[in-house]
Amino acid sequence: MSRSGALDRIDVLLSTITDPAFVAVIRAEPLALSGTPVLAYWVQARTNGWQTLSDIGSTTTIMVRAYFRLQASADIRESIELELWDAMVEVDTKLRGDANLDGNCTDSTVGSATVATLDMGGALYRTATIPFDIQIYEEITITP
């Protein structure tokens, strides 16, 4: 199991989404976007969990977010709502399809998605945010 392997596997899984057709999958929270739709993911939090006499397990939350640039056209804004929903379902499906991320974690859980409008550099984006919790048993070894 490796943390870098888990992130690499997430990248591979998210890159296979074809509907909606993302122009990029980014492993970082973006500061600006040159084109959309874009799918980004980043490490959000880490919590120590269960502990034994010899090791500690953890849960790391990866935030996955889809970005769709809003336009003045009502028709385009309406189509973005469907694309948001499709993105939420596809991210959920891809990540649940490989719960141990090709052997790089013990288990994982896809959380509840939320939708919001985000201002980034004066441009408005409609976003879908999906938390993804990765559990790694025995991540830290305790030396007596």
Question: How does the language model describe each region?
Answer:
Residues 36-41:
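A short glycine-rich, His/Asp/Glu-containing loop-to-beta-strand
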Residues 1-33, 45-144:
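Charged, amphipathic alpha-helical segments and their flanking helix caps
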